[in-house]
Amino acid sequence: GDDGTAILRSETSMEPSELTSMMVDNPTYHKNPKSLDAKLIYSLFIPCLGVGAMVFLLMRSMARGYEWEMNKCYGCDLCDDACPVRLFNAGDKLNIIYNSWNNEDDGVPLYSCLTCTACTNACPQLVDYDSYVDIRRSLIVGGPPATEIPHTLLQAVLAAEAEESADESFISVDDYPIDSNVGYYPGCVDYIDQEMIFSHVNEGTMNLGDTTTAAFTLFEDMGSEVTYLGRDFLKCCGHDQKWQGMTEVFEKLKSYNQKKLDESGIDTLVTSCAECFKTFAMDYELEDMKVMHTTEYLIENGFDMNLQTEEDLTVTYHDPCRLGRQMNIYEEPRELVRAVEGVDLVEMEHNKEDGLCCGVSSMMSCNENSRALRIQRFDEVKATGADVMLTSCPKCVSHFECLKFEGDPRHDFEILDVVSFLARQVNAKNQ
């Protein structure tokens, strides 16, 4: 309710007096009514009284909206039970939320949250914890500490790309060959891996730059005309910058890309990156443009290629957090895989809305805790007897491949993007 209480859900019809007796008081509601204002004054100190006051009031208004959201919590701890971070340290969701809210610090960093939405998925009140983490990170001047970023050089390059001075290095709409109303955006992991060595995972067997090539193999085999919108045309979507709290950088990237897309004549934007897909679809204002993940696009456009594997194959599928829990795309990748004759799709213990996170969010917190989470996921893969672990996110592929590169003989299965897996069968069919 508006006074900080939470009403328990029930399918049973009840009298108002009965409902009143079932209200649960949120113990934190009366504890911290002014603490956020103090944080905002500290974080947003602007000596200019005029503009500064307006900015402060705007940010306080935004934060107050999230304060109301947080007060829906009545402390049932179901979010803690679902939180993957809590499996390996004391950094559960409620600690992160309450400590940052009340200016208390018990050593649990705000950046330990994976923003995987497992907590909201388990919450009976559907509290949007991820949005709170997003706005709190945005109030931290300078963004996350360098120790949280494993690829600092790459992130610095992407941040520099956001500046207006970098615009001239990108091809204009007038000079770019756009010959279709459907555009494909590769994302940073895929594109950069084709241009340079992305990371040490390239020393293994995975080619992170393969997904775009695979996607166009499928488009061509289906007879779909799709324009490649390269990273020499569009900038980074800004997903990592947004969730690292680098709001100013994200807004610059968004402004540039949005203007370019509006002028391009594209009415459908397709990408194989779950993070890019979620960002374009939810964080941009592309009102006249349909944003689709490649698996969605293939299904909607009648994917039916009569594919089959050379020999029977057992596979399992890992649901990316951004594609699954956050965008509700579960069946499309599975439908595509099941369409291949000779494939037996076996689900892991945790799948779909209960799927485990790959452990690294927004290129942050690549540490022993995230490694332990991937080991647990690999144990689930092994339990299925799968020859191949499939997923639909290049970041998930790279993080899992990073662990596989360690050479543990128990991890003798292959890791592939669904699009790459399908393209492999198309190439075999066409030989």
Whereabouts are the PLM-identified features?
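Transmembrane-cytosolic junction motif
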Residues: 56-73
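Acyltransferase donor/substrate-recognition loop-hinge adjacent to the catalytic core
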Residues: 299-314
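Iron-sulfur-cluster electron-transfer modules
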Residues: 67-70, 90-234, 240-271, 277, ...
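Selective detector of the "anchor" transmembrane alpha-helix that sits immediately C-terminal
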Residues: 38-58
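Hydrophobic alpha-helical positions that pack around
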Residues: 317
